[in-house]
């Protein structure tokens, strides 16, 4: 019975992973500066997607939820650009397991 239960759990997780990622990532700004642009692109992409903040800003100390629907995987590159034009990039992040907290240590 234990082997059957383990197989069922593994099957569920493998099926979910194969179906892709359908969720979100929370991005927190702890840089000390307001973030004016936020880009989230698939890790294998050669270019950045559109700014997900649109006309909004992400003030220092605040968090925004970015919806990621129908993604082929949960591995993303995430870049923020602050009020001074400085960029912060996190590469190859598994957003199914980790949210993002940008700090000055992430500055490019």
What positions do the PLM features span?
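Sec-dependent signal peptide recognition
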Residues: 1-7
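N-terminal signal peptide c-region/cleavage motif recognized by signal peptidases
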Residues: 12-15
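Structural beta-strand segments of beta-rich domains
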Residues: 21-25, 64
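Asparagine-centered strand-capping/turn motif at beta-strand->loop junctions
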Residues: 25-32
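Short acidic/proline- and small/hydrophobic-mixed sequence motifs that coincide with surface turns
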Residues: 33-37, 88
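Intrinsically disordered, low-complexity Pro/Gly/Ser/Thr-rich segments with frequent PxxP/GP/PP motifs
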Residues: 46-72
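A short, solvent-exposed beta-strand micro-motif common in secreted/extracellular proteins
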Residues: 73-83
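Extracellular beta-sheet/turn segments enriched in Thr/Pro/Gly and aliphatic residues
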Residues: 87-108
């Amino acid at each position: 019975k234990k082997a059957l239960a383990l197989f069922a759990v593994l099957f569920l997780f493998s099926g979910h992973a194969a179906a892709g990622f359908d969720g979100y990532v929370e991005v927190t700004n702890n840089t000390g500066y307001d973030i004016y642009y936020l880009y989230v692109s698939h890790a294998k992409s050669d270019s950045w997607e559109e700014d997900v903040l649109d006309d909004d800003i992400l003030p220092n100390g605040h968090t925004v939820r970015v919806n990621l629907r129908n993604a082929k995987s949960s591995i993303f590159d995430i870049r923020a650009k602050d009020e001074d034009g400085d960029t912060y990039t996190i590469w190859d992040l598994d957003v199914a397991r980790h949210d993002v907290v940008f700090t000055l240590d992430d500055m490019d």
